[in-house]
């Protein structure tokens, strides 16, 4: 876990699913964490971007779970929608996490990152298209 309180990893053990981080991603993370101005700006802006993204998703046939981090957990309207949605978005250059195999979730859950405003607008636009056309 990145940014966890000391000892948190030992206490959580196997209670949460892990995500492996490859060396290129780890190098990018080290570079991003070394830029203090970027970190401060991001911490200030992400909550605003997250709220805007969540409000933009209202009216779509999905449940938006409350979040205090840089992603939103979404429950889709059926167990058969998640995989189709992940492929649909992927073909449009939008990567989301399908939660089919995460304990306590299932194939009707996806996790979307809170991006920059233009990235969030693209995500919302494509989600609207997906649900409008049932692709």
Segments (PLM) and residue ranges:
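Short beta-strand/turn micro-motifs at beta-sheet edges
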Residues: 18, 98-101
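Generic non-transmembrane alpha-helical segments
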Residues: 31, 52, 56-60, 84-94, ...
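Residues that cap or initiate secondary-structure elements
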Residues: 8, 78-80, 102, 118
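Conserved PLP-binding catalytic core of the aspartate aminotransferase-like
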Residues: 47, 59-92
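PLP-dependent aminotransferase class I/II
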Residues: 1-58, 62-65
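Short hydrophobic/aromatic beta-strand micro-patches
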Residues: 3, 73-75, 113-115
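PLP-dependent enzyme catalytic core of the Aspartate aminotransferase-like
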Residues: 91-94, 101-135
């Amino acid at each position: 876990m990145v940014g966890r309180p000391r000892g948190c990893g030992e206490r959580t053990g196997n209670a949460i699913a892990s995500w492996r981080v490859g060396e290129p991603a780890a190098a990018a993370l080290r570079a991003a964490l070394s830029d203090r101005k970027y970190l401060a700006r991001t911490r200030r802006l992400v909550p605003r971007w997250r709220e805007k993204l969540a409000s933009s998703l209202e009216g779509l046939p999905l449940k938006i779970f409350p979040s205090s981090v840089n992603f939103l957990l979404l429950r889709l309207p059926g167990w058969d929608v998640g995989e189709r949605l992940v492929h649909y978005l992927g073909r449009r250059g939008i990567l989301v996490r399908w939660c089919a195999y995460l304990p306590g979730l299932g194939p009707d859950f996806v996790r979307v990152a809170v991006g920059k405003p233009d990235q969030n607008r693209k995500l919302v636009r494509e989600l609207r298209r997906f649900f409008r056309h049932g692709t």
